[in-house]
Structure formats: structure tokens, C-alpha cells
Amino acid sequence: MDSSSTTPLADYFWIAGIETIAYDDPLPSGSQVAASIAEDGEQQPEENGVNANGTGAPRHHARHSRQNSANRLSNSRFSIHTLDEIDGNTQSNRSSVTIRPAHAQGNGLPNEGVGPAPGIGLLDGFDFDDALVKFAAERENFLDDLTFSAGAKLQARPPMVNPRAERIKAEDSDQSGRRSPLRNLERSIKGSIRRKMSFRDMNSSRRQPVTPRASTPGAGAIPRQGSIRTTRRLSNYNSVIPPPEPLNTDPNMHPLKRRFEPVLLDRYPAKDVPEETARRGKFPDYVPMFAFPNDIQIVSSDDRPRSTWHGFTMTSDDNSKIYGITIIIWTALTSDVAEELEKRCEQWRQRHMSNEERELAASLGVRLAAERANLSSLLARLPSVPSGSSARDALDDQISTVEEKISLMTEMLRPLRHGAASKIDGLTAGESGLWSPRAYGILGRDVTRMAFWKDWLRAVLVPMTDGGVLRIPPSSPKVGRWQPLERYVVNLCTEAFSPLGSKTQVELGVRELKLYARQDAVNEIPGSRTIDIYALFRCLSLDNIVALFEYAMSESRIIFLSSHTGMLHLACHALVNLLYPLKWASIFIPVLPARLLSALEAPCPYIVGVERRYERIELPEDDYVLVDLDKDTIDATSQPVRLPRQHRRKLHALLQVAAPAKLRYGVATGPPPYAMESFPYDAFSAENPSLYNDYASPSTLAQWVAQNSSTFGEPSPASEVKPPIFNAFLHSKVDPNKPDRPGTSKSTRTSPPSSVSPVSINFPPMPTTPVSRSDSGFALTSTLREKRSRNFDEKTRRSSSFGVDKHGPLHRPSIPFLNGNGHAPSMSISAISVDSQPYTHSSYGGGYAPSTYAQSTLAASTIMPNMLIQPVFNTETTVWVEGHCFNWEEGALSSSCSVCDDRAEGDGIYKCSGCSAFAHGRCLGCVSLACHQSFYPDRVRAAFVRCLASLLYTYRKHLGRPSKDQKNNGRMYAFDMDGFIKSLPYDQQEYANMMRETQAFNEFIHERETKPGTTASIRFFDEVIMAKKARGRPGIVSGLSRLSTIRSSHGASSNSSAFSPPSRLKIPTYLSDTSDHMWRTASVPVPSAKFPGDYRSIVTRIPARLDTSLMREPRVIQGVPRPEQRGTRGLVRKQVPSMLGTSPTN
């Protein structure tokens, strides 16, 4: 990629989906089948140890632990193919079954659909109310009884865990940092590549010969270190990734269960433009397969399925990474296609279902539609009944009863839905109730752009939801009008340009929405402004986070498992980002398609993500780590190589105050809402607020890297904590008293007016028509319980170890690292510095810090590795939601809700004590973003980089002069690995020996051997090490001797130098240098011209291909104005401000 100003902001825009829906295979005449219901794309139970041919399976098959339909009902919220929405409008998603050939040795005879099913009688006298009562009381077994013609009950599959794997618990029993005793001598061979090749299935791979090291005496038992070239060859994507497996279509399969292979429908720029291909790179193969990792199925659903998103990573022919982001939008099938599909479904029902089953399913659908109509009439009566009256209470009880009945009946219908018609009158939205997914995506080569691409895609796809995203201001000439998708695509891929360093930022507009693309400064951790790490910390406990980090450091084969594809993307990128300054150099596939699951047998380290809904997941025989993001568990075949004891305890302690969301703020475990779907709670929220602010937030890495441990947990100033952006369109609404956009000649240092300001008088006008079909009263049915009651689910409470009793449940500044009694640091704890002042000087603090290998700065009683979590309780005036502590404020009538932007109702409103966000009682259930006081991403990154800086503290001392041969090979330095390891304390030498066998550490050393120390990426980490040295006591700068270790670990700084910067200490200023943190705004022309045709039909369509007639000639190309176009009219297009003449050095 060219790094000049002509680099596009995105390389390609593409569309993928189903080209045609055709069932060309003839229907079988009458084959015997064992039909079993598998709702919402979930796996069909198989007999334990029996494959399709009836023979014993020679391998351990990965199987899901869900045993029946009842268990499946509770584990499928927010997924693509399950539509149990928050609002209580339960929906069925797909009528699908798995058809497998019946065998004589099976456990039961199949039902050919000619007789009554076992366990169910005729519909005569069937009582639905009794069935509902039985279903509510015996839900675990009731759905099993409804498996009518499936024959005898099959055995449930065991959990998807290899028998050799064990649950990893981060206990403090092995704190020496040595190898776990579970690893015997034969399995303790180091070397990531050879260790991965030693599992039993690699018969075709020959082990490397074991030769002693010439420079290491007595090293005959240690295998020779693999060369970088050999490691790269084994880690090559194309060498270990097999070709995709073909689709296996069963002629007896239900039409809605059949999978279709996704295809590329269109792309921009098109493939017939060779000059663009040469500049942007070759469009990779298999993009549709990564967009639909589990292929495509037609979905039967009452409402439009929820839109989801995910990112993926591919490797090109030259071994470079290509990153993609995609959003899935569901489009209704046309009437003719739906009619043909319904005919085939009816033929299947006639062949494979009994009359009783079909009648029961149809009757249940009719009954459900009647109950939904009854609910609508009750809700219509609600505004006319006075609040607080007995009639209102009775009406509320009646509504609750009907809602519960609808919920139960919908769950009953889900496993039987294949027996009913796809469309139920009064219940199904759209023409047919059949939906097909379509993927819109972006490709590029900059991983830091993925968050920007995602939010840009969400913005341009809002009109396609046809009102499904709530609280979007209506289009108008003043606010802005939607443009065709084609013009937005040209604007991103051709007219927009990549920012040049940290001196510029690119502003891209979508209607009134302004998005800002920035590049990290050279003295910042790459990706620290754009890569999300909160989602990973929400899914896993701190113990599991540290264990996962240890597995990644030793280059294990890590497999992430989740029901949400977006969560896989977030977790993989977060883990790699936390390894800085090390770079993951092996296989990296955040979303592994189902047809590439055999890649799990790759004989090298990898980080891959696997969806839980895949039908067959075969785990490796040995040497893997399975991380379940939905259940917060880690299963592995061996314990991780633990960090040295003091480093591990110090890292864990810093994470407790940097990521207190679960410990102190009651955040539930699991993927966040924005990882589950594109528009959580039908709102356009912004999990990355910096993308919508023209003023870049100041970097705090220098502060937390150099901050003393005793002050690491101090809260951010109230002026720096802003409420989350729950509606980006309201956040970017046009102010009539402000220019249309900030100028490009200088930086704009003022943020746009907040739409949630309690003193703001600029409120958007109420639309003349509802924003969407379900927006009346902002989804009244979804928030009815919140309006009638203030009872919410209990969440965990912050730990009393952080002084809860002293400071109360508010987000107030609290002293970090307190013990159970909540006392402040004192001189009695010798390892805690007296200096607890906040970071106010330009230096890195003058408080006490240990020397290189001293004991931890935290006393053992304050580490709290197994801290107990106390629950937080909701009261009449306090509600905890996503880390927000909402307190009821009486009389705050001038405040506006941060979620819906309406004024306070009644006599008050809820206000978060941490970020000052406001919310109505009915809007508390729609709070999808965490409070900024509950999670500090900069401090989390600082904790990990401090840990690695401590491990590699003296590495530069062992970079010496290269030999003549090394110099001829391009090396500027020669690293003495043996000398580096011998200089470490004894308890760290074994961990360093492990690191020397990893590819990431070898790449780390190789980069420093071949590049000067002034290189930006190298100098940054060296300055982090210097900041660690600056935290030490004055006069003990190096701190490498054993005597200095003893002195620093037992002597507290009690002189005046502890309270002021030491005069003799040279303060590194590189980390705190903000001279290049300018981010001047350069605006890209916003598409705003008129276009022919019906406005609504054009902007709301879900196109399968881009319409070139709706495109316009680019006004600029990557910021460069086009040459003057002198046609017959002799008009010259007006040039817009661009980046001409601007360079990072200016």
C-alpha cells in the first residue's frame, strides 16, 4: 500500500449473498428418515460415538453441551438465527429440521407420517391452557415430548471438550513461575513450532533433529531453535489452510434447512479496472465464505431478523493481512420465490409429518395470532385508563398474563414451526415471512480502520432497515437527506483518503453524521484509539484474562468459541493488541468458516474463532486452548506457562483497578450488546465515541506507564468523563448557530454540543409521523414493565476491598489497593510508596518504585488474587445498568434523557453518578454502553505493557556489535540471548527460556538487530522502559544489583524527594510529547446532490448490485482534485480542500 496522500481510506466495497434460490434436485419418492427438529440452525443430536455410516468414530468429535430444545431456548438471545428480543415480543426465526437417513441399528423405528405420533394423542380435546401450564412447569421435558415422528429419543451429545482437556483455574498455587507439574519431562519440550508438531496426527511431518547448542553447555537435551525462515514457512497461511469443503445437500432435507453457498454479487471498484487492482491489491478469494462462515439458510421469521456484524482477517498471496468488516441485512423473499418455496415445504410436510402434527402446528399458530391481537387491543386501552387506579392495576395484570402466554406459546411453536405455514396472519411482518441475508462489507489493509469501517457501514445501511433503527431524525433539507448507497461507496473508496500521521484527521459525512478517521501517533500503542478491548474483559474474568495472556505469550493454539461472530472478532483482536510490543506472527483467523474447520489441525500456533452453531467441530487431539467467551471458561490440555510470580501478581493487581467493571460495578459476564448485533436495542449507539468527535481525546498512556502503582487506580477527573453516545445521530445534530463543518485550516478544539446537556435548549422537533412502525411511544410494548415497575435484575456489587463501605455505591474517587477494612496506604506497608499524589508534573513522579527485579510494590494482603465479588443491589432510587449507577434525582425536569433525548417525565429522572448520563425509567433497559468509570482501556494497556517492560527491562544491554557475517546479512546489532537470560533473577530464567523459543520474541529481537534504536516503534517501547526506571528512587537509576534490589524492596522513601520530582533524574519526554498530536481536520465532500427516481424506494432498497446510473464522477480522488472536466457545457467542478502539499513533516 502506498503511504502517500493518494492512499484510499478503504480498498474495496462489496456485496455478497445468494444469487438465485433454486431447488433443482427432485424430491425422493419415499425414503425412510428420522426427522428431528433442530430449531434456529442448531445441531441435531447424534448417537454417541456413531458416525453417519453406523461405525464407531475413531476420533473425538467436538459436540455441544446443549442437550434439548429447552436448553437451546435460553442460550440463543441476540444470535443471527434466534430472535428472542429484549422487548418481550418473542419471535420464531426459522422452521428447520435436520433429516438423516434411518438405519436398522438405530434406537427406534422411524415414523413415516401415517400414524399418530408417540406421546401425543389426537387434537380432539386438546387443551392449550393445560399444555401451557405443563410447558411452564416442565419445560425441560415438554419439548422432548413434542418430537413426534422422530422415533425414540436419541442420546444427548457430550460437551464439546476433549477428554484430555481440563478446566483451567487461575489459582495461586503455582506462583513460582515454573512449568506446571502436570507437564511431565517428556512433554516439557520447548519450542512453539516443534511442540505443536508433536501431536499424534502429524505422521507426515518429520521432527527436527535434536542437536546441542554450541554456546550453551549441557544443552544436549534441548532441541535446536528453529530458524525464522522455517517458522514463517510453517506459519504461512496458504500452507496450513485447506481448500474449503463442498456443501453436502441431502435430498431429504427440509427446504428451509438447506444451505446455499454465498457468492460475490458485486464490488467497487469493479474488476474490469486494472489500474485500481494494481493500486489497491488483488481482490481476495473466498470473501463470501468469510462473510457467511456458516453458509446461508433461508429463515422463516415473523419479523425481520436482527442485523449482525463481524470482522474477518484473510492472508493474501504475499503473506500480508487483509481485513474485512461486514454487516448482514435481511431482505424478504419476493412473492414468487416464497410461493415456490412454500410449495416445497408443503410437499415435505406431506411426506414427513403426520396429520396430527400439522394440525397441532397450524392450530397453535392461529391461537398465537389471536393472543397477539388481544395484546394489541389491551395496549390500545392503556393510555385511557388513569394511572394508579384499580382498573389500571387490573389492566396491567391482564397485559402481563397475555404477554407471558404469548411468550410460552411462541416457545412451544418454535420446534413445531416447520409444520405450519411460513406466514401467520396478524403475526408475520412482510409479504411472506421468509428472509434471505445479504452482506455488505469493506476490505482494507489497515487494522486500525476496522472500527471506522464498521460505523460507516452502519450509518449508510440505516435506511435499509426501513425504520427499524429508532430515534433517527427524519430527513429534511436542513438536517440532511439520505443519498443512494452508490454515492456513499464512491465517497469512501475513491474520494476519501487516509490520514497522514497524527497531524491530520479525515472527516467523512453521512447525512448530518460526521465520522473522523485518525491514525495513532508514533508515541502511542498501535490501535489504542480504535481496537476495542472492553468486550474481552466483559466475557472473561481477570483470572482467565491473565491465563489467556500467558497462553498467547507461549504461542499456544488458541480457539475462541462464541455464539456471536462479532464477539469472536473483538476477542481475537483484543488479545493480539494486548501483546504489544510483541506481534503475533502465526496464523490469525478471528472467524474461521465452517468449511475450513480442518485448519484446527494446523501444526503451528494460531488464534482462531469458531462459532458455536457449527454442526461439526473437531478439536485437535492434543495441545490446544478452548476459550468459551459465552461461559467464561478456558479448557486446555495443559496448564499455561505462568508468568514469574511477582510479575503475575502485579499485573493482576493493576487490572483489578483498571478494569473494575465486574468487581465494583455489577457488570454481568458475557458479550456486550454491541457485539451481538449491529443496532443493539434498535438504536445507533457508538461504542467508540472518538469516531464522532472532531476533538481527539488526549493520550494518557504516558501518565499510566509512568504512574506509581499506589496511584494507578485514581479515578479520572470529572471533566474528562463524558456520557456514552447512545444515539450518534442526535449527538451530531446540526446546530443552526454553528457552521456546517469545522474548517480545515486549523484544529477545532471544541466538541460539538451534546444532545444530552441538561441546560441545552436545542431539542429536535417531534416528527410528524412515527420514526418506524414500532416507534410509537418508543416501543411501548418493549418497555411496559419498566414503566410499571422499577424492579430490575440484580447485578454484582463492587467489592468491599475497594472501600465500598467508606465511599458508598457512587463512582467517587477511591483510594486504590485497600484491604478489607478500607484503610489508606500508610508507612506500615513498606512496599507502598508514600507518594500518592496524582500525576500533575511533567515528570514521571518522584515516588518510590522498585528497581528492576525487586519485590512487588504491593503488599501481599493488597494483591487480592481471589477477591470476592459482592452483589450490587437495586433500590427504589438506585439502579445498576452496564456499570452505570443510576440514582433518582427529584425535580431534574430540565434534563434530557441520554438515550431518547426526551425531557424528564414526572417528578425526576435517573442520573449516573459516574458519567452523568441521564435516563428515563423506561430507557434504563436500553442502556447498551458501559460507564467510562467502570473500565479504563488506557490503564489496561498500560498494565500489560508495564509487565512486558519489566520482563524485557535489560534487553538493550545485550545488543552488541555484530560479527562480519552478521553485518553482511544486514544486522546492525547482535543480541546475546544467553547473556540476557543469565542476567535475570533465577525465578525468571525459565520463563525467558520459554520466550526464546517463540516466534514473537524472535521477531522482536530481529527487528531491533536490523533497525536503529531511533525507529519510532522501537524507541517507543524503550521509552516505556525508561519510564519504569524513572519510577525508581533517586540515585538508584539502574537498580540491577542484588543490593539495590534488597534496598528498594525494604526501604520506603520518606524524604522530601518522594513528594517532588528528583532533580538528578533525567526525565524521558518522548512519551509525553504531544507536538504531533494535532489531528487537523480535512473534510471529504459529502454526497448531497439530487438523483432521479422515487426518493424513498431508492434509499430504502437493499440492492444486490450497485447501480452505476446512481453514481457520480468522483469530485476528488483520495483528496486530489480531478483535472478540469471541459465538456460541451464547459463547466469546471469546484475543487474542495484537500491534502495537497501536506506531509507528516510539515
UniProtKB/Swiss-Prot annotation:
Residues 744-760 have a biased composition (Low complexity). Residues 25-75, 156-226, 730-806, 1121-1146 are annotated as: Disordered. GO terms for biological process: regulation of Rab protein signal transduction. Residues 246-500 form the uDENN domain. InterPro entries: C1-like_sf, cDENN_dom, dDENN_dom, DENN_C, DENN_Domain_GEFs, PE/DAG-bd, Tripartite_DENN, uDENN_dom. GO terms for cellular component: cytoplasmic vesicle; extracellular region; host cell. Residues 522-656 form the cDENN domain. A zinc finger (Phorbol-ester/DAG-type) spans 883-931. Gene3D superfamilies: 3.40.50.11500. Signal peptide: none annotated. One of its GO terms (molecular function) is metal ion binding. Keywords: Metal-binding, Secreted, Virulence, Zinc, Zinc-finger. CDD domains: C1. Disruption phenotype: Enhances V.dahliae virulence in plants. Residues 769-783 have a biased composition (Polar residues). Residues 658-1016 form the dDENN domain. Residues 164-177, 732-743, 784-797 have a biased composition (Basic and acidic residues). It is found in: Secreted; Host cell. It comes from the Eukaryota. Its main location: secreted. Interacts with host cotton EIR5A (AC A0A5J5T2N2) and EIR5D (AC A0A5J5NT52) and host N.benthamiana EIR (AC P0DXJ0). Belongs to the EPD1 elicitor family. Acts as an elicitor that triggers defense responses in both Nicotiana benthamiana and cotton plants. Triggers the accumulation of reactive oxygen species (ROS) and the activation of cell death in cotton plants. Induces significantly enhanced resistance of Nicotiana benthamiana to both the broad-host-range filamentous pathogen Botrytis cinerea and the semibiotrophic pathogen Phytophthora capsici. Stimulates the expression of EIR5A (AC A0A5J5T2N2) and EIR5D (AC A0A5J5NT52) in cotton plants and recognition of EPD1 potentiates EIRs to enhance cotton PAMP-triggered immunity (PTI). This is Elicitor of plant defense protein 1. It comes from Verticillium dahliae (strain VdLs.17 / ATCC MYA-4575 / FGSC 10137) (Verticillium wilt). The gene is EPD1.
